[in-house]
From Swiss-Prot:
Species in which this protein is naturally found: Siniperca chuatsi
Protein name according to UniProt: Nuclear cap-binding protein subunit 2
Subunit structure: Component of the nuclear cap-binding complex (CBC), a heterodimer composed of ncbp1/cbp80 and ncbp2/cbp20 that interacts with m7GpppG-capped RNA.
Pfam families according to UniProt: RRM_1
Cited PANTHER family: 20 KD NUCLEAR CAP BINDING PROTEIN, NUCLEAR CAP-BINDING PROTEIN SUBUNIT 2
Reported function: Component of the cap-binding complex (CBC), which binds co-transcriptionally to the 5' cap of pre-mRNAs and is involved in various processes such as pre-mRNA splicing, translation regulation, nonsense-mediated mRNA decay, RNA-mediated gene silencing (RNAi) by microRNAs (miRNAs) and mRNA export. The CBC complex is involved in mRNA export from the nucleus, leading to the recruitment of the mRNA export machinery to the 5' end of mRNA and to mRNA export in a 5' to 3' direction through the nuclear pore.
UniProt KW keywords: Cytoplasm, mRNA processing, mRNA splicing, mRNA transport, Nonsense-mediated mRNA decay, Nucleus, RNA-binding, RNA-mediated gene silencing, Translation regulation, Transport
Cross-referenced Gene3D superfamilies: 3.30.70.330
Record localization: Nucleus; Cytoplasm
Domain RRM: 39-117
Gene Ontology terms, MF aspect: mRNA binding; RNA 7-methylguanosine cap binding; snRNA binding
CDD domains, per the entry: RRM_NCBP2 (cd12240)
Cleaved signal peptide residues: none
Length: 165
């Protein structure tokens, strides 16, 4: 019986996900430990036009926000669809995971995940073209994330010329 009660009272929103930062400096155990104590969230699927003020307005509803770091294209130095939100307390971050993860911001469903802690340099996209890796391969047109994916944009002019003959 107690096993069933534990399952009912578990809070999957604040559990640590399977995702791990592949660039983390340290071993898996250290990363797990930091994630379980973290006050920092990675927030993805933001519009390229979402402002720091919009992020602050939403995420401050769950607790006192220490700082927000907007993700930047490492080449253009423009927003590229993600950010880090640091809270003063773990409780504030847990509330955001419970109540804000999966909600809409700037007409997009955002996703939040635990982060082991922001380190300088992580604000830049890791894609080959400077933005996020996921935007490199996207085939659909998404005006809030810069149109077509970077690789699709490179092939579009050739396809357009081929289709005119």
């Amino acid at each position: 019986m107690s096993v069933k009660l534990n399952a009912l009272t578990s809070d999957s929103y604040i559990d640590v996900s399977q995702y791990r930062d592949q660039h983390f400096k340290g071993n898996r155990y250290d990363q797990e430990k930091l994630l379980k104590q973290s006050h920092t969230l990675y927030v993805g699927n933001l519009s390229f036009y979402t402002t720091e003020e919009q992020v602050h307005e939403l995420f401050s509803k769950s607790g006192d926000v220490k700082r927000i770091i907007i993700g930047l294209d490492k080449v253009k130095k423009t927003a590229c669809g993600f950010c880090f939100v640091e809270y003063y307390t773990r409780a504030g971050a847990e509330n955001a995971m419970r109540f804000i993860n999966g909600t809409r911001l700037d007409d997009r469903i955002i996703r939040a995940d635990w982060d082991a802690g922001f380190k300088e340099g992580r604000q830049y996209g890791r894609g080959k073209s400077g933005g996020q890796v996921r935007d490199e391969y996207r085939q659909d047109y998404d005006p809030a994330r810069g149109g077509y994916g970077k690789l699709a944009q490179q092939h579009r002019p050739t396809e357009a010329i081929r289709n005119t003959f």
